[in-house]
């Protein structure tokens, strides 16, 4: 298979080697009759796909593989030269993607700093801290999160605490849930968060106390039913996370 930069010519009557941009070895395969030339894509993975050129009673399959990190990062850079740069959302999403995929971390930190400059809020500071943690800048990241905490809403802190539990950072999660309790006392999600943190630490009795408080303040039947089931789990010394 030869892929050429010239897509105007018909067939190979006036083939020019200098226009070849990629080549691959493949073999014909039998295929149900296809009257019109078609390209079929199958077997998708994160960084590859199989393409088949089908025509007549033949199929010519070949694999296309790309460096997904390099491809996406280049696109992010290009996007941030346009309208995406006019809002904090553009650099924030670019930084988030890089941190989530553990790639291009230095530039991700610069994008996160730009997002903070444009709109200092919990999410932008949290992403900046995530980039700093990924780069091993733990002291700086701790200070960034300390700055972010007072700017967060109830559910933002609750979600962040749950994220930390998932990452195995139970002590840090407990600090977040405690901060949420101090900032937003007597709210059912806050008490639920305290219960999750204490459950992760293995203190099921104390966790049940907070979960019972959450049950009293819970405004809807669906969540109240989930809380009841989790109280039962804690009574059996089972983690609710």
Indicate where each model-derived feature is located.
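Residue-level recognition of tetratricopeptide repeat
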Residues: 96-97, 130, 162-163, 196
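Canonical tetratricopeptide repeat
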Residues: 93, 127, 159, 193, ...
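Helix-start (N-cap) detector for alpha-helical repeat units in TPR-like alpha-solenoids
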Residues: 88, 122-123, 153-157, 170, ...
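Long, contiguous interaction/recruitment modules in multidomain scaffold/adaptor proteins
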Residues: 1-86, 107, 114, 118-119, ...
């Amino acid at each position: 298979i030869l892929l050429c930069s010239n897509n105007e010519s018909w067939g190979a009557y006036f083939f020019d080697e200098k226009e070849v941009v990629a080549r691959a070895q493949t073999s014909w395969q039998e295929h149900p009759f296809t009257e019109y030339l078609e390209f079929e894509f199958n077997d998708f993975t994160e960084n590859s796909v199989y393409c088949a050129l089908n025509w007549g009673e033949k199929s010519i399959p070949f694999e296309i593989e790309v460096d997904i990190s390099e491809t996406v990062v280049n696109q992010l850079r290009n996007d941030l030269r346009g309208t995406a740069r006019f809002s904090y959302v553009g650099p924030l999403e670019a930084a988030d993607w890089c941190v989530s995929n553990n790639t291009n971390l230095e530039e991700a930190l610069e994008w996160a700093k730009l997002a903070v400059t444009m709109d200092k809020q919990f999410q932008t500071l949290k992403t900046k801290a995530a980039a700093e943690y990924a780069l091993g800048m733990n002291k700086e990241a701790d200070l960034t999160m300390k700055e972010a905490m007072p700017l967060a809403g109830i559910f933002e802190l609750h979600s962040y605490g749950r994220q930390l539990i998932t990452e195995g950072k139970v002590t840090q999660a407990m600090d977040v849930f405690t901060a949420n309790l101090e900032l937003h006392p007597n709210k059912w999600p806050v008490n639920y968060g305290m219960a999750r943190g204490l459950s992760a630490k293995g203190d099921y009795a104390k966790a049940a106390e907070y979960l019972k408080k959450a049950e009293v303040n819970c405004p809807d039947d669906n969540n109240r039913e989930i809380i009841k089931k989790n109280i039962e789990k804690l009574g059996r010394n089972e983690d609710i996370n």
